[in-house]
């Protein structure tokens, strides 16, 4: 393995950790909130009728994240949606370590500014336990996606799981990473 360190991880260890320790008066370095994982998922409800769209979604996710995507299956049958338990209806990728920092860096600094009429991400996307979720309406904001080759424009979800105890700590952590929260 090389001794390569992602830019955001370096920023975290050199700048963000001391700032957070000072801001929240932590007694131990282990109390400082950190990123655990980033989950990128795509729900493809239309996959029930057109299997090709699910494969396209998997390919898009793999292109965006640089890691193999897993197809997700329906947990329950819902008659109104013509959905059976076990049907493949989406895809997801869980990123950890260096890939997580690289993805978050690209997401914050390259993809989000390409969103039409972008005024910042919703500051209410926290779940009460220090995790943040944001929905993206078009996958074409990522430069890796070739506009001419996509089957269908679809959205995706990005969940950032942190070790923070409260939403305030998590918001401070993500803001220091450069997440552009709406005022």
Swiss-Prot record:
It comes from Treponema denticola (strain ATCC 35405 / DSM 14222 / CIP 103919 / JCM 8153 / KCTC 15104). It holds the Pfam family Ribosomal_L5. GO terms for biological process: translation. One of its GO terms (cellular component) is ribonucleoprotein complex. SUPFAM superfamilies: RL5-like (SSF55282). This is Large ribosomal subunit protein uL5. InterPro entries: Ribosomal_uL5 (IPR002132), Ribosomal_uL5_bac-type (IPR020930), Ribosomal_uL5_C (IPR031309), Ribosomal_uL5_CS (IPR020929), Ribosomal_uL5_dom_sf (IPR022803), Ribosomal_uL5_N (IPR031310). One of its GO terms (molecular function) is structural constituent of ribosome. This is one of the proteins that bind and probably mediate the attachment of the 5S RNA into the large ribosomal subunit, where it forms part of the central protuberance. In the 70S ribosome it contacts protein S13 of the 30S subunit (bridge B1b), connecting the 2 subunits; this bridge is implicated in subunit movement. Contacts the P site tRNA; the 5S rRNA and some of its associated proteins might help stabilize positioning of ribosome-bound tRNAs. Keywords: Ribonucleoprotein, Ribosomal protein, RNA-binding, rRNA-binding, tRNA-binding. Part of the 50S ribosomal subunit; part of the 5S rRNA/L5/L18/L25 subcomplex. Contacts the 5S rRNA and the P site tRNA. Forms a bridge to the 30S subunit in the 70S ribosome. Belongs to the universal ribosomal protein uL5 family.
